[in-house]
Amino acid sequence: MFEKLSNKQKGTLLAFIGVMIITPDALIIRSVSVETWDLLFYRSLLPGLALLVGYFVFFNHRALDDFKNIGLSGIINALLVLGANVTFVMALANTDVANALIMISLVPIIAAIFSFIFLNEKPEIITWFCSFGCLLAVIFIFYESYELNKYLGDFYGLLCAIFVGASLTVMRRSPEINFVPSYILGKLATAVLSAFFVSAFVIGTHDLLLISLMIITVGVSFVFISIAPQYISSPEVGIFFLLETSLGPLWVWLFIFEEPTQKTLIGGILIILLVFGHSYYMIKKENIDKVAL
């Protein structure tokens, strides 16, 4: 059935499933009681090992070749995955969930800018307009975070968006490469790095069960997200991260009652509207251009 879908439908379905699976991730992170680097270690190690074992079980003989064939693009992507992992957890450790996820909602705009720089995809005027609007909204949120001494977490969230946008661009640039092995290496590299800062390698049963769920929310989700750019553009994949921006704080509010501030809501709504409007316009324009050809 999947093979009968068009490339646009395949990419859209993969991106949607991937981001929907990851939406409870911030809630799980907020619910565990371990130290930040301990969380980062287990959040990377367990999904990384699970995906590694699963990949070799499912693909058997070709698995090792897939890892060997990731090339320079795969190595760069693995480093970007490492950066995104570290900055995401650091963002949630230093600011509210809503603030962190709002920063990450900038992924489509950042991906569009990177596509212009590295893929020679000339952006529309609307891209620059939306980028400027998002910049103003980010400054608005940053200013409040500075007053509340939470600006460091917002900064980590912005860095995470940059890493994810760059990763999507790398994957878009080399659609012939299977980036799932690259993602697995990125997770394992994060575990190795964070192991140097772990305070204790023993955690409670409750925390272990919650972190084990990240095999699905972090591991499986990004397998779908890693494959999606083979079928649709980076900005199109990035638009689905708005689901995480919208649903992530909702789960946290419903279960542990963490409410975003009024200024965060105002800035966040502005960013979501700008990013959604930009991505919708770009998708429609791409479809019109294809029909014209």
Locations of regions flagged by a protein language model:
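Loop-to-transmembrane-helix transition segments
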Residues: K10-G18, R62-T87, L152-C160, A195, ...
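Helix-helix packing/entry segments at the starts of transmembrane helices
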Residues: A100-L106, M171-A189, V218-L254
